[in-house]
Amino acid sequence: MFVEYEPGDKVINPSKKDWGIGQVQSIIKYKVTVNFENVGKKVINANLIELIKI
């Protein structure tokens, strides 16, 4: 899977909307590190979860 995110992108996790808006911090292969406003830093496997850019 090609990851179409860049550091600074604002995203939401559609399966965890209560996490709030997140900002992409880094991308390493398929792992996207996002700092969400309600739960802090999470590492997302982009092969399993498609984040939605806002």
What are these regions (language model features)?
Residues F2-I54:
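Basic/aromatic-rich interaction segments and small domains that mediate binding to polyanionic partners
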